[in-house]
């Protein structure tokens, strides 16, 4: 009973994320591997938190609200989110299946909910059904929210790397910093309140935490819905037509639905950018394309005199 209660929210969220992948479903084997990688990431998280807590106890040997904040934001958040990110990066960055923007959110959530699953099982078996019901609507969806932020910028980092637009480092930093901060603040509000003896402060902290959790859920759902709706191909597939290009080089195009787009797919209806009737190989890098510019290096399509 407790085991089922611990895993029900995990399974529900995984299904929600998976079935919002409209363009191209990810291989089940890859997703299972990511889930178990997330479970494995709890080991470095435990070690990191133990070391961080030992150091913090030396620096601040007494319990206080400030100590709770520091522990949550500077130790718990980084220890858990960096471990998840490393698993995500090692498994998916060079994967041939990572070819659509929404894929990154799917990958990140599967890793994060693997972590959440094993953590939730432990908490539920230690504290009982009340904890199971509370975490079903807070901690487990919270881990999914942190992963949505991570995946959103992880996808942008991959796209920036492929298109060489100079923004990859910034997006990579955001894919780590934002989950760490949102996770750290989530825990800090709780941990700070636990260290306080003032009922008013504890009550205000509880209200702040509830508002923060609701805001996390709303923003994450908006990102999921928009990312799913605007999902676009981000890579060049060997042997296939060009599927990614620099928006500044390729220019805009007007879809049949009337939407003006920069990217490969219409953000409103999902139609693909119209291709030319003929394909060509880039004379500089050899990439196969059906557009007027090479998406790999930006070289314009050769004219008749160059053919």
Predicted regions and their residues:
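Hydrophobic alpha-helical segments at protein termini of multi-pass membrane proteins
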Residues: 1-307
């Amino acid at each position: 009973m407790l085991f089922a209660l611990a895993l029900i929210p995990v399974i529900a969220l995984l299904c929600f994320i998976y079935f919002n992948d409209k363009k191209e479903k990810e291989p089940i084997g890859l997703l299972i591997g990511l889930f178990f990688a997330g479970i494995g990431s709890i080991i470095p998280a435990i070690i990191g938190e133990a070391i961080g807590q030992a150091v913090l106890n030396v620096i601040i040997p007494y319990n206080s609200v400030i100590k709770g904040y520091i522990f949550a934001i500077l130790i718990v958040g980084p220890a858990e989110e960096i471990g998840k990110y490393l698993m995500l990066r090692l498994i998916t960055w060079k994967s041939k299946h990572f070819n659509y923007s929404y894929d990154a959110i799917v990958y990140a959530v599967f890793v994060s909910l693997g972590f959440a699953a094993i953590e939730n099982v432990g908490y539920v078996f230690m504290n009982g059904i009340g904890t199971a019901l509370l975490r079903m609507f807070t901690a487990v969806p919270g881990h999914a929210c942190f992963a949505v932020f991570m995946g959103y910028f992880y996808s942008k980092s991959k796209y920036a790397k492929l298109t060489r637009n100079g923004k990859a480092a910034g997006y990579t930093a955001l894919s780590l910093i934002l989950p760490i901060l949102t996770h750290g603040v989530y825990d800090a509000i709780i941990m700070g309140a636990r260290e306080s003896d003032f009922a008013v402060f504890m009550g205000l902290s509880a209200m702040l935490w509830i508002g923060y959790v609701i805001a996390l859920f709303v923003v994450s759902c908006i990102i999921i819905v928009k990312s799913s709706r605007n999902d676009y191909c981000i890579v060049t597939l060997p042997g296939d037509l060009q599927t990614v290009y620099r928006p500044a080089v390729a220019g805009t195009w007007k879809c049949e639905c009337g939407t003006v787009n920069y990217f490969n797919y219409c953000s409103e209806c999902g139609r693909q950018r119209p291709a030319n009737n003929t394909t060509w190989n880039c004379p500089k890098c050899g990439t196969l394309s059906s557009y007027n510019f090479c998406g790999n290096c930006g070289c314009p399509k050769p004219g008749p005199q160059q053919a």
